[in-house]
Amino acid sequence: SIGYFDQNGNVQNFNYKRYNIRSNVDTKINDFLSFEMNLAGRLEVRNQPGFSANPDDWNNIPQQAVRALPYVPEYYEIDGVTYPVSTRTNSSYVNPDAAATQTGNSNTRNTYLQTNAALRYDVPFVKGLCFKAMGSYDMMFQNARRIATPYYTAVLTLPVAGTTDLSYIRSADARGTTKSLTESAYYNYAITTNLSANYEGEFGKHSIKALALMETREVKSHTIGATGYGLDFLSLAELSKVTNKTGDGSEKIPSISGASSHTRAAGFVGRVNYAYAQKYLLELSCRYDGSYVFLNKSGNRWVALPGVSLGWNMHKEDWFDASWINELKLRASAGKTATQNGLNATYYMDLFTVAGNSLVLGGVNQGMVYASTIGNPNLTWAKVDSYDVGVDFNAWNGLLGIEFDVFYKYEYDILSSVTGSYSPSRGGYYYSYGNENKRDYRGFDFTITHNNYIGDLNYGAKLMFSYAYRRWLYYAGDSPNAPEYQKLTGKEVGSLYGYIADGLFQSESEIRHSAVMSDKAVVPGYIKYVDRNGDGQITYAQDMGYVAASAYPRVQYSLNLYANWKGFDIDMLWQGATGRTVSLTGEYSYAATGSYGIMDNTFLTKPFYHGGNSPLYLLENSWTPDNKSGEFPRPSITTVSSNNAFSSTFWYRDGSYLRLKTLQLGYTIPTKISKFMGMSSFRVYLQGSNLLTFSGLNKYHIDPEQPGVNNGYYPQQKVYQLGVKITF
């Protein structure tokens, strides 16, 4: 098969192309020996401007567009030169159009090759026994090239107090005034080998299946990159042509980077399945996995992972006479799994850092070496003990099907940073990482299906529902001296951290009789916070903590509806989630506490943030003396560390949603016509994705599936596809 895909982005000069080819070959050499090979290749080409649209990057292009002021002109002339106008007041280089068209270009080419070959031998003198050898080679090569061209904007400067004069000044791109060229190459390959023996046999009412397997995997990667500065001619954009000078003529040293990695893992698997009269089912399994990440001398390099499952097909019992029930099965399972849990192979080593001019000896600044990480040779796998009980039910030949499961998972030996977990008497010499974190995961899920035929009409539905609750049983980062509301232990995984809000201040009298932040101006219409420790003041150290809200949904569900009639078919998928909280505050500025990721306003919560535009709802629904029931605080253009800027329950919103994920309409021409045309089948279809979304976040223009609101994000797209599927 051959495929081609071409898509332009929502942002100008963004393009993605994909070319792919696949070939599968199955050959039967003789009655006992067969061979198969699968080959797949893919080329991806991404082109974009020199300025990023990555949602994790500050001032990315979508964010610039969202916060653009509508009243500034598109261009402005300064000293006879025309410049794009910054779309914010008193803020340089911010112009989404210029960022998309004048910042250079970035081209990334990813080439993938995936190969898989297998040889199977069916033992002629032992029925049901076969041996299989499989090998795969996967390769990925990336070549990236980025030309950064600086640009200037005309920035509207607000008048000085007491004047009415507006002026424009020329401002340089924050990336500097020097053209640069960055090139990088990345190579990765993975080799996997798999040797297995399978056996299937029946002896009267007894059925046995057995598997023995050995697998190895080796991965190597290498990357190298370089950036050169100073390009006299963009048409000669080569690293050999850079001048290594900045726009003012000073020297600019080029940067060179490189890294490589080599990993290995191996595993052994054994599994036995037994069934008696297909009524009573038993499965025993065990994995024995090893990884290079763990030290062999610690005894933790290898881990044994047993599992067992039981099943009872009750409907096959002789005494079971409910003929309308097609299936009634009870089952239970227990097992252990393990992961490396993001462990780095260097975590078992002591790491040292060289600090320059750290102390003075003899009147001279001296460098020093200190231990930045104390290695732990006893680090081990993160493990999960899983337990599940379920039932499968099917009746009336598919009119009603039910699958129901209740599960519990205990996760332990999770990688943790143990800094602060030991007393000062240790002098700071303790392991930097350990396997101390623990959490559990419990819930249930069910699936209900319905399928029916009425004449030429076939229709059906599938409802899926899942509830899961995860909590920290122990979190090593908790300080023993902290109040309970500042500890993660015992709280839900994904719990949000912030103040508890108690509405908005309505009067000066209320402010005087309430706990407030001593270093923040507070006026009527500002957020009122709960004094959690009761000391009469609001402080980050004492009153911020975890609240009963999680960024992860507890409930997820979907509904698939389908029907076909005389060649016409329709298929739709609805999906949604509830029990999730979304915060309108973000984490991309250096907050008042001097730490990232805890509190900050965004353009969704602060009018005219950083001199940019505001959503209309933020002003129309703000508190004013005439609108004291407003949803948002009193409008303010003070600094980001103002009273209202902190993460709090005031900014938390229900993240529940229901979305029409896909809708497909199709028609398959009659078989006799397709065969007359030399085809087995011919189908044409129209499909749409992300067509409708019902969510309380819609009014904030926030996609409920987005990971965060920090810097804006690339939006979910409505996609329409018209396709033809031909089978020969």
Region locations from a protein language model:
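Extracellular/periplasmic, surface-exposed regions of secreted and cell-surface proteins
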Residues: 18, 24-43, 47, 51-52, ...
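Conserved small-residue
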Residues: 225, 437, 451-551, 582, ...
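Periplasmic-side early beta-strands and strand-to-turn transitions of outer-membrane beta-barrels
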Residues: 3-16, 50
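Conserved SET/PR-domain catalytic core that frames the SAM/AdoMet-binding pocket
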Residues: 472, 543, 553-567, 661-666
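Glycine-rich, aromatic-lined ligand/substrate-binding cores of catalytic
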Residues: 550-585
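Extracytoplasmic gating/loop element in the C-terminal half of outer-membrane beta-barrel translocons
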Residues: 92-99, 291, 521, 577-678, ...
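A short beta-strand motif that forms part of the nucleic acid-binding face
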Residues: 2-4, 41, 288, 408, ...
